[in-house]
Design a protein with these regions (language model features):
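Redox- and metal-dependent alpha/beta enzyme cores, enriched for Fe-S-associated oxidoreductases
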Residues: 61-111
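Structural beta-alpha unit
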Residues: 1-26, 30, 109-143, 148-153, ...
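A short, structure-level motif marking secondary-structure boundaries and short turns
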Residues: 53-54, 86-88, 116-117, 147-148
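Short histidine/acidic/glycine/proline-rich micro-motifs that form metal-
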Residues: 15-16, 59, 85-90, 120-122
Length: 187
């Protein structure tokens, strides 16, 4: 499996139950580094070839640019930016910032980073779930999400979006906590 023998990756395994997934999310809430959650329902990933990155209107979404660019550069994976289908321009602006980052890193390092922008069918509130639902269509090996900043009433009653994605996903899910002091990936 791709994650074995890698000291840089925080890997959490749990069963697919809501309680088990929520326990992992609560346990990892303060981490400054990205972490990967794997359940028994997920297929084994031997190589990263395609990474789905759902992009919503939230300003924290751009934190994922550095992570997906790093992974793509190191593994040669193709990045799929799944842009939320919103009426406003915020998701489009976030995708633009992510593309700018991808191009800048590609130019600076002299590597070719492959990416594409796909318009989601759902809006910002449901784009993460759409990524989980369409992972087979995209032949994805990883879903990259930003964790919830604060849990609102809906999250407390029904569970945060990332929990639902992890429960539905058939591939590992990498989460990034939205923190100003987010750990920076370096070579």
């Amino acid at each position: 499996m791709i994650w074995e023998n890698n000291e840089d990756i925080i890997l959490k395994t749990c069963d697919s139950s809501a309680r088990a997934v929520q326990h992992v999310l609560d346990e990892c809430r303060e981490l400054r580094t990205p972490y990967v959650v794997i359940t028994p329902a997920m297929r084994e990933v031997t190589a990263l070839r395609r990474i789905i990155v759902p992009v919503s209107r939230l300003e924290e979404e751009i934190y994922k640019a550095e992570i997906c660019t790093y992974l793509a550069r190191k593994t040669g994976a193709h990045i799929i930016l799944l842009q939320a289908n919103d009426y406003g321009s915020r998701a489009r602006i976030n995708v633009g910032k992510m593309v700018t980052h991808i191009k800048a890193v590609s130019e600076k390092t002299g590597t070719s980073i492959s990416y594409e922008i796909i318009q989601a069918k759902k809006d910002s509130s449901k784009v993460n779930r759409e990524a989980a639902e369409r992972q087979r269509d995209f032949v994805a090996d990883l879903i990259l999400l930003i964790a919830s900043r604060e849990y609102g009433l809906d999250d407390l009653l029904f569970g945060p979006q990332e929990r639902h994605v992890i429960q539905r996903a058939l591939v590992p899910v990498m989460l990034v906590n939205p923190r100003e002091d987010l750990f920076s990936l370096c070579d």
